[in-house]
Amino acid sequence: MGLLSAVFGTYSEREVKRIRPIVSKINELDEVMQKLSDDELKAKTVEFKERLNNGETVDDILPEAFAVVREASKRVLNMKHYDEQLIGGVVLHQGRIAEMKTGEGKTLVATLPAYLNGLTGKGVHIITVNDYLAKRDAEQMGELYGFLGLTTGVIVHELTNEQRREAYNSDITYGTNNEFGFDYLRDNMVIYKEERVQRKLNFTIVDEVDSILIDEARTPLIISGQGEKSTEFYKVADYFVKTLVKEKDYTIDEKANAVMLTDEGFHKAEQTFKVENYADAENVELQHYVTQALKANYAMRRDKDYMVKDGEVIIVDEFTGRLMEGRRYSDGLHQAIEAKENVKIARESKTLATITFQNYFRMYEKLSGMTGTALTEENEFREIYGLDVIVVPTHKPVVRIDNPDLVFKSEKGKIMAVVDEIAKAHEVGQPVLVGTVSIEKSELISSMLKKKGVPHQVLNAKFHEQEAEIITHAGEKGMVTIATNMAGRGTDIKLGEGVLEIGGLKIIGTERHESRRIDNQLRGRSGRQGDSGESTFFISLEDDLMRIFGSEKIQGVVEKLGLEEDEAIESKLVSKSIENAQKKVEGNNFDIRKTLLGYDDVMNKQREVIYKQRSEVLEGEDVKEEILHMLRDVISDAVNTHIKEDAEDYRESFLYLISYLNDICIPTNEVNLPALADMSKEEIVDHLYDVAVKSYENKEAEFTPERLREIERVVLLRSVDTKWMDHINNMDNLKQGIGLRAFKQVDPVQAYQMEGSAMFEEMIDSIKNETVKMLFHVKVERAPERVRVAQETNAVHGDKPSAPVGPVRNLNKFGRNDVCPCGSGKKFKNCCGREA
């Protein structure tokens, strides 16, 4: 492979070569564009739109459109796209990932494909990692789009529905992945089509695409309502696990981040909870509480995985070190941690709508992304999203020096060496950016620097604006900045006066991350646009990566050398071993994400069916025909269930059948039982269907056709929503228990697909039964109105299997003693609450 690349160039190099002729065409138009007046340049937008309406494609007008944006950018922003940025723009327009190093101007690159695709009027979404960057980019680049006659919107958390709709109707819309995902889910929970805010998902450019499509891929978005389960069980389980002894009662698998009871632990659980067999299926709920309590107490670490602040447990993002205010771990883990820390335990929530980023972004007509580091995950981008990664050449060569890793025997020796290295650089005024893996490590280094009298800034980012401000100054003379690995992404570090001469920005990594990509991101903060700089990673054998995944060979080498605590070695063997450990973890994480996608694809297909049905109802389509199809299915199922060919007493079977259908759709005393005895099953179905349709026609006369059409939509919508929400939770429970099938040599994903499909069919049957029954029993004086079956209370960015939850939004249900929202005047429990 190496020889072929050397002869023919890498895949990226070959693709870039293909794009260069397009860049030449854009450059040829440069002089023409410069001669145009502002008004003539602006008029190009109208001209392009007309050409598109007359049959030209966006590819046809690409060179000219890019040339227009380039010239407008020079006039409005005083920034002119250089050739490498034009290449990046073409890559994004083609629906690929552009890997562009830090400082190469990705924000400006996005304006090229955004303008070109914005001309179609179908909308372009530009995804950023936080609200601050969304607002900043929309404001800055909005001037350019506005000059050219395109509108710009920005979606941030605090907007009203009206403001969101306006932003989505803009030609180009900026916002975070969470906001776009939640709006999609909410749009599929509305009860009137006018409440929707999003348009069809057309073209998106995802900034920091690796962070969103890979790091957060396992984290579902969840909109939830309040659950009913008591929180007392968490306290009881917490008390129990705190009595257990490590190795004797439980073991910890650090690689899998799991805690398991031993046989002795099982025995203790049986004694404590007075159950005969703890592992029995009937004790699944007890197992759930104990499992989460074990994990909370022995796998989750305070100040690393979460912090306790003002009596509240707050998740710490494992990639950025940021506090994730408002997010909660799902599946009861957050409650278990609250019990462990003895703070108020919030109730578990009930999921009302959910989707993963993997499936949300795959719905776009065209998906593209940009980042400084994507090549190490090229296979995953291609396999999961069908995206190529193209490495765009840098405008100036990278001259940063990446030093070999320094390996220390102990954590203490390593930290002392890091502090000494920072102090040395500070003496000569060289700015230093120190990357840590946790808030805890940041604070340890900070306290040691204080003792040495070295002034510094600590970035445990809570406010993105403040974070961006600190990062902006990190390249100035004498600055020392300590930050968790990815804090401040999206903000450039520009070098201050005189810094180039003393070596540029010095990067110190205090630990290797389990992903090479995160390490590369830290290195990439230095040496932007051909600046000088250097990077070094300080590693100890006590680091998590080395301890859990490092080979015994390295331990042996270090012990043979008899290193002192503060002595370090540079070794190719060690560096290679670290890289192998990282590859192993990356491969493992990819497999997990692929497996989860296998699970989520089942739900995704089901979600598409349900959301399509909802959409048809909301669009005001006449659903009478569908209701009649449901009616026939309900009758047919009832006949097949009650009438068996080999039954001895037909009369008894018919009595049960008619009694059953009387409750649903057949009026009492309307069927001649003896006449049924001479009919085949098909004839019985036809006869009963005719009786039911006649009854329904009477109902229509009673209500008027127009009123009954609206009632049909209301009832179908309510039935679909109620059953779908229950189904989501049932599928979630199925997924929790399905892993045990692996012990029986059954593929869990396959089992989940088969059983999930059967459950979905049952849900569809249940929707049909409930809808038909409600429509045949509806009364003029209490005809149902459109109401939400639940109210949103929380939106969380869900939970990876054993990883932080993302955003959840909770929905309040109607209290059982509240007045029913249907307008009957009865209490909810005596009215629609009975049907629910």
From Swiss-Prot:
Note describing how the cofactor binds: May bind 1 zinc ion per subunit.
- The UniProt annotation places Zn(2+) binding at C820, C822, C831, C832
Its membrane topology is listed as:
Peripheral membrane protein
> How is this protein named in the record?
Protein translocase subunit SecA
Residue positions annotated to bind ATP are: Q85, G103, E104, G105, K106, T107, D492
Described by its record, this protein's role is as follows: Part of the Sec protein translocase complex. Interacts with the SecYEG preprotein conducting channel. Has a central role in coupling the hydrolysis of ATP to the transfer of proteins into and across the cell membrane, serving as an ATP-driven molecular motor driving the stepwise translocation of polypeptide chains across the membrane.
E.C. number, please?
7.4.2.8
Top-level EC class as recorded in UniProt: translocase
Q: Which family does it belong to?
A: Belongs to the SecA family.
Quaternary data: Monomer and homodimer. Part of the essential Sec protein translocation apparatus which comprises SecA, SecYEG and auxiliary proteins SecDF. Other proteins may also be involved.
Compartments it resides in: Cell membrane; Cytoplasm
Q: Does the keyword Protein transport apply?
A: yes
UniProt keyword annotations, A-Z: ATP-binding, Cell membrane, Cytoplasm, Membrane, Metal-binding, Nucleotide-binding, Protein transport, Translocase, Translocation, Transport, Zinc
As cofactor, the record names: Zn(2+)
InterPro entries named in the record: Helicase_ATP-bd, Helicase_C-like, P-loop_NTPase, SEC_C_motif, SecA, SecA_CS, SecA_DEAD, SecA_motor_DEAD
Does the record carry Transport as a key word?
A: yes
The alphabetized list of GO BP terms reads: intracellular protein transmembrane transport; protein import; protein targeting; protein transport by the Sec complex
- GO cellular component terms listed in the entry, alphabetical order: cell envelope Sec protein transport complex; cytosol; plasma membrane
Question: CDD domains this protein is in?
Answer: DEXDc_SecA, SF2_C_secA
Q: Source organism's superkingdom?
A: Bacteria
User: Where is this chain primarily localised?
Assistant: membrane
Gene3D superfamilies given in the database record? Helical scaffold and wing domains of SecA, P-loop containing nucleotide triphosphate hydrolases, SecA, preprotein cross-linking domain
Catalysed reactions, semicolon-separated: ATP + H2O + cellular proteinSide 1 = ADP + phosphate + cellular proteinSide 2
